[in-house]
């Protein structure tokens, strides 16, 4: 028997959909800024080849990138702070933060299952182990982005913070690495949403999902095991 089940409260959905365009703008404007001093390489190759900049028309737009970055970074920070505060006030953090080291093992099992290398579907609550590890890591990455961003933005006034990351270049390297991490997360996240189907996507739009005895997408849940 199928029933409607509330999965995501309105506050969580708002934070999610506000963060999506903000993060996109921050990444995009960050690449516009990076163009002016593209120092990172993979061996002999630049991280972003010249054709990437010309194809996407993001070359010679340093001023635009800085203007966008310095405006939207405050909105990104405010949205992130409010989200973290909400998770603690509402108790949502209990479902998001890994409870023990076993969660990391279970997260690996989830990855193997998603790659069709493990037959047994993992037991999950509202979030599976891989989601708990990933979403907690994203929050930590957000904090890292803010700190390294401030270290780059005000290296003289916040010299102590800049030095914590090994100086200006160290802070910029960490900031850049975190940005690449966001891009990789976004790609995997979109693929996972597509594989999970409309029911999962709808729950993040309207808050409700269609549930049955075996749980969403046929995965066993803690509730169904109790029954």
Spans of model-derived segments:
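Membrane-embedded alpha-helical bundles that constitute the cytochrome b-like, heme-associated redox core
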Residues: 1-227
């Amino acid at each position: 028997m199928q029933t409607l089940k509330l999965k995501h409260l309105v506050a969580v959905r708002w934070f999610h959909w506000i963060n999506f365009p903000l993060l996109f703008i921050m990444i995009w404007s960050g690449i516009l800024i990076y163009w002016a001093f593209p120092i990172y390489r993979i061996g002999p190759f630049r991280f972003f080849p010249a054709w990437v900049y010309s194809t996407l028309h993001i070359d010679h737009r340093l001023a635009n990138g800085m203007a966008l970055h310095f405006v939207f970074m405050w909105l990104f920070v405010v949205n992130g702070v409010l989200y973290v505060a909400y998770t603690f006030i509402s108790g949502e953090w209990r479902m998001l933060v890994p409870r023990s080291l076993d969660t990391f093992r279970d997260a690996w099992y989830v990855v193997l299952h998603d790659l069709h290398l493990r037959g047994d579907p993992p037991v999950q609550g509202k979030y599976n182990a891989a989601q708990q590890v990933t979403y907690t890591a994203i929050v930590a990455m957000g904090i890292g982005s803010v700190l390294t961003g401030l270290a780059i933005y005000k290296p003289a006034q916040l010299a102590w913070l800049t030095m914590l990351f090994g100086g200006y270049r160290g802070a910029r390297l960490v900031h850049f690495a975190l940005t690449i991490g966001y891009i990789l997360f976004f790609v995997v996240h979109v693929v996972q949403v597509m594989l999970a189907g409309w029911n999962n996507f709808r729950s993040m739009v309207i808050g409700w999902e269609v549930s049955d005895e075996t749980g969403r997408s046929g995965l066993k849940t803690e509730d169904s095991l109790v029954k």
